[in-house]
């Protein structure tokens, strides 16, 4: 049995029930049922960088097409092709069109790794994996270590080696430097919506990326943003086009609503407690000074 995933506009989900001996037409039928994109209108991409699959012969076996366990198939709809689908697909598509999708926050745990969990969730098309943080921390450390000239002490605030050791620790919080690195790695614009200032910081804005993902930030905690259809089992959308400015406006509306409800943390005034020595602290500056003096980096908000 092949362990496959499919990624479409609506999100990422498992693609079960196929083997290397399954035929292309069987896989396309399964993809149509999952994504709502009829087989005649499908354009399938595989690998990195993504390459287009030859769909001319539906009788070919998946093994012959170079499809292996662990692969993710990207499903796009070619609107230039006829899209007459089965009644089931047509009915599902009609129901989806009648509903209005909304942009919403997907809450993740406040466990010092919320940034990494949130970024993984959005770039993977809605895959929630709280165990992804160690791998992402290690990835960032490898990228930083590989380019000590670009990632020097002036940029990192500590030596390259110290930073690499620091970011691997599970109690270390991620921030702007890590978002910038992940934007380059995933080749997508990462927009961080700040609920305190109601502004959007766009990492990778000038890099020419075609994809955009969004996080919402309250001063200490990150959550991913997703566009979803209420009361529907249709997977949420977390990856947007960089030409989609509507989603940016919706994100600012969310941030403004959170600000009016005071759903943010003023990092200069919030009260913390060092979870190592139990000392009370006020604001980010005191926390940083305490960490520098004692080496304690595990803080909880009071």
UniProtKB/Swiss-Prot annotation:
Stretch list, region Cys-loop: 108-114
Keywords: Cytoplasm, Hydrolase, Metal-binding, Protease, Thiol protease, Ubl conjugation pathway, Unfolded protein response, Zinc, Zinc-finger
Compartment list: Cytoplasm
Superkingdom, taxonomy of origin: Eukaryota
Parts forming coiled coils: none
Residues at which substrate binds: 220
Region (UBX-like): 5-83
Active site: 111, 114, 221, 296
Any one annotated GO CC term: cytoplasm
EC number: 3.4.19.12
PROSITE patterns per UniProt: OTU, ZINC_FINGER_C2H2_1
Biological function: Hydrolase that can remove conjugated ubiquitin from proteins and participates in endoplasmic reticulum-associated degradation (ERAD) for misfolded lumenal proteins. May act by triming the ubiquitin chain on the associated substrate to facilitate their threading through the VCP/p97 pore. Ubiquitin moieties on substrates may present a steric impediment to the threading process when the substrate is transferred to the VCP pore and threaded through VCP's axial channel. Mediates deubiquitination of 'Lys-27'-, 'Lys-29'- and 'Lys-33'-linked polyubiquitin chains.
Listed name of the protein: Ubiquitin thioesterase OTU1
């Amino acid at each position: 049995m092949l362990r496959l995933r499919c990624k479409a506009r609506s999100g990422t989900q498992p693609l079960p029930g196929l083997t290397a001996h399954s035929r292309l037409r069987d896989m396309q039928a399964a993809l149509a049922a999952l994504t709502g994109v009829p087989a005649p209108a499908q354009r399938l991409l595989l690998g990195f960088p993504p390459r287009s699959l030859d769909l001319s012969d539906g009788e070919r076996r998946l093994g012959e097409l170079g499809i292996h366990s662990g692969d993710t198939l990207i499903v796009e709809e070619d609107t230039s092709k006829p899209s007459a689908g089965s009644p089931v697909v047509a009915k599902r598509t009609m129901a989806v069109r009648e509903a209005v999708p909304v942009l919403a926050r997907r809450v993740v745990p406040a466990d010092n790794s919320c940034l990494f969990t949130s970024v993984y969730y959005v770039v993977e098309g809605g895959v929630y994996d709280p165990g992804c943080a160690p791998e992402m921390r290690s990835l960032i450390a490898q990228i930083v270590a590989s380019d000590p000239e670009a990632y020097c002490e002036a940029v990192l605030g500590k030596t390259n080696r110290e930073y690499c050791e620091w970011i691997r620790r599970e109690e270390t919080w991620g921030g702007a430097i890590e978002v910038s690195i992940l934007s380059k790695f995933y080749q997508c614009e990462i927009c961080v919506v700040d609920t305190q200032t109601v502004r959007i910081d766009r990492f990778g804005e000038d890099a020419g990326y075609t994809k955009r993902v969004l996080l919402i930030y309250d001063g200490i905690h990150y959550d991913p943003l997703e566009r979803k259809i209420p009361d529907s089992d249709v997977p949420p959308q977390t990856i947007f086009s960089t030409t989609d400015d509507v989603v940016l406006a919706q994100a600012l509306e969310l941030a403004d609503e959170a600000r009016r409800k005071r759903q943010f943390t003023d990092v200069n005034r919030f009260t913390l407690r060092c979870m190592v020595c139990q000392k009370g602290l006020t604001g980010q500056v005191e926390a940083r000074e305490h960490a520098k003096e004692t080496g304690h980096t595990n803080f909880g908000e009071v």
